[in-house]
Amino acid sequence: MDYSGNKAAMGQDRPISETESMVKMNLSKDGKTLDLTATYLKEYGAKDISQMESLRPLTNLAFGTNLCGPKGVKWLAQSKVLVNLTSLNMFYNKMGNEGVKYIAVSDNLLSLQNLVLTDNEITDEGAITLAKFLPLFTNLVRLDLRLNRIKDDGKNALKEAQKIAAVKHLLLDKVEGFQVKS
């Protein structure tokens, strides 16, 4: 059954006061780190976050497992408030290729040094789009795209883009980043 048009499924039935309360509980004392992992804020929670002026100093946003979808990603990527982010963790948000495109073309996320897009149903199409814009992310050092559906075409496009971009750590395969040397 498709619940995509359901207000509750998109988080539209949640009052902004509830989102504000979650932000206050999970915001660091210095106001620079916000961990909203697994709070299931969904699309409208992402919209609320993207418009909170109090989050302008934020440099680190952990927004994994919120199931915000591509429209929620669009709110965050186009936010005029979240322009100081250096780290954005968006694992498991069901963004797909549409969502990754919003990140790729965002002028507001160019300060990112770390971007985690793990487990988001991204395919070659999204990877190739991201690869085209990767050189514009001059501060990006680490890009994590593990556990997606990226095949050789997408991986090769990203590896080629990495050669002219600042990205030092490009994680594409599920075993990368977990290797322990004895």
Which residue stretches match the model-derived regions?
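Conserved hydrophobic beta-strand positions in leucine-rich repeat
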Residues: L34-L36, L58-F63, L85-M90, L112-L117, ...
